[in-house]
A protein has these predicted regions:
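Serine-dependent carboxylesterase/thioesterase catalytic core
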Residues: 1-66, 77
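C-terminal catalytic-base region of ester-bond hydrolases, centering on the histidine
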Residues: 62-138
Length: 138
């Protein structure tokens, strides 16, 4: 999930033809906002809070590439500040309007073992390759 945030930041430095992110909390984490006070030395909580610098900078990045965000919708732990997949809120995962959003009925952990997710990723890769063949560019 955090790989999607890293990839988004990389778009400022590297030409990227397209991307698929999985359960990325692009708007940050409400849980991290309060958890960082209980574990102040845990860097993850400081970096993924809703008002953290990495999250705010990510929100300012405008995408002009094909990007698919897979949104995991099952789990729903009660202390995450809204409907969630056990780790990230669905609202945070769906916060970007410049991406294709695809919901899958999995928890944050199941999503990585999903045949459906593999199919989505391979489909997006095939479309990218086909576009390259048709236009001789990516």
């Amino acid at each position: 999930s955090l790989g999607g945030l890293y990839a988004l930041h990389l778009t400022k430095h590297v030409d990227i033809a397209g991307a698929v992110s999985i359960s990325t909390p692009f708007a940050g984490s409400w849980t991290a906002d309060w958890a960082r006070f209980f574990v102040p030395t845990y860097q993850l909580f400081r970096e993924v809070g809703r008002r953290s610098i990495p999250i705010k900078e990510a929100q300012a990045i405008n995408l002009n590439i094909d990007w698919t965000q897979i949104v995991s919708t099952k789990g729903n732990v009660p202390y995450h500040g809204g409907q969630n997949d056990g780790v990230c809120t669905i609202k945070s995962m769906k916060s970007r309007k410049d991406m294709e959003l695809i919901e899958v009925p999995h928890t944050h952990f199941e999503v990585l073992c999903s045949d459906l997710v593999v199919k989505i990723i391979l489909d997006r890769y095939k479309k990218l390759i086909q576009r390259k063949k048709n236009t001789n560019t990516i």
